[in-house]
């Protein structure tokens, strides 16, 4: 169980779920042309999980001192798992992930795509060792990588199968994935800032310069409120523009996504304690989960 917690298995489950839903809840129902066999798709999921798990491990290695302040009960490195073991696991998972990436890239006739796995692995290392100490940049990098976990499915499964004959449908489905990717990026970016609000004490002692440390909790909370409010308006606009005639999907978005985000907006305005921020971080995680779970519902939408 210690090793599962080290790689943050809940987050890995979420990544696997979203990739599976994109293929089997969106691509297959729309009968778009796809490139990967079921086996190779499973390898894509495994490669993504390996890179993500390695990123979680290296982040924990660099964050040991900070985590002893922010969440001492969850520290694993140096207590239940040695740093050497964690480093070996980090290297092994990266080798497996990148190796599978090379195989898949060549199997679809896009050998250059292998570089993506190397770049993602490098970004996760740089994030843990350096980028997370730069205001907002670390938050953006993590959020970008979350969004890319969705886009990777389209790059490897959808893009290579595009032809002149199927271009219109393939592009329409690709657009849906891009919308969800932007949703994941924006929501995760907000959540990363909320986590910075939650971890301000440990980050300050660890020398990490986050937005709450730079401008204070109150101002940061106001910025988060504005970002969340903009996201609410953006989702409502999307519903009006594209889902107006689809009542089931519109109601799902309204109650599962817009409603919780409005609750978040109300609570973040007056949030002051670590418990408040921890709760709000969980709210955003639930919203992201519910948002991703709406992917299969799009099979009932006529894409334009």
Where are these regions (language model features)?
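Intramembrane alpha-helical segments
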Residues: 2-5, 74-164
């Amino acid at each position: 169980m210690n090793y599962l917690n080290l790689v943050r298995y809940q987050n890995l489950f979420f990544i696997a779920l979203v990739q599976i839903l994109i293929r089997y809840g969106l691509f297959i129902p729309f009968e778009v042309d796809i490139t990967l066999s079921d086996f190779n798709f499973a390898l894509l999921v495994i490669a993504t999980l390996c890179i993500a798990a390695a990123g979680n491990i290296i982040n924990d290695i660099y964050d040991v001192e900070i985590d002893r302040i922010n969440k001492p009960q969850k520290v694993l490195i140096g207590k239940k798992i040695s740093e050497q073991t964690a480093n070996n696991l980090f290297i092994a998972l990266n080798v497996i992930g990148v190796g599978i990436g090379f195989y898949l890239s060549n199997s679809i006739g896009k050998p250059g795509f292998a570089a993506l796995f190397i770049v993602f692995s490098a970004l996760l290392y740089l994030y843990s060792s350096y980028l997370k100490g730069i205001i907002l940049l670390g938050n953006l990098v993590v959020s970008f990588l979350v969004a890319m976990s969705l886009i990777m499915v389209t790059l490897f499964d959808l893009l290579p199968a595009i032809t002149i004959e199927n271009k219109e449908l393939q592009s329409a489905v690709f657009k849906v994935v891009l919308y969800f990717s932007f949703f994941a990026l924006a929501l995760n970016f907000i959540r990363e800032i909320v986590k910075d609000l939650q971890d301000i004490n440990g980050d300050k002692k660890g020398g990490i310069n986050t937005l709450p440390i730079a401008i204070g909790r109150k101002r940061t909370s106001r910025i988060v409120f504005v970002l969340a409010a903009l996201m609410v308006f953006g989702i409502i606009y999307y519903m009006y523009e594209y889902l107006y005639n689809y009542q089931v999907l519109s109601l799902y978005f309204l109650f599962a996504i817009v409603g919780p985000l409005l609750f978040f907006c109300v609570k973040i305005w007056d949030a002051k304690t670590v418990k408040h921020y921890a709760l709000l971080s969980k709210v955003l995680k639930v919203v992201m989960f519910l948002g991703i779970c709406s992917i299969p519902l799009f099979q009932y939408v006529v894409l334009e």
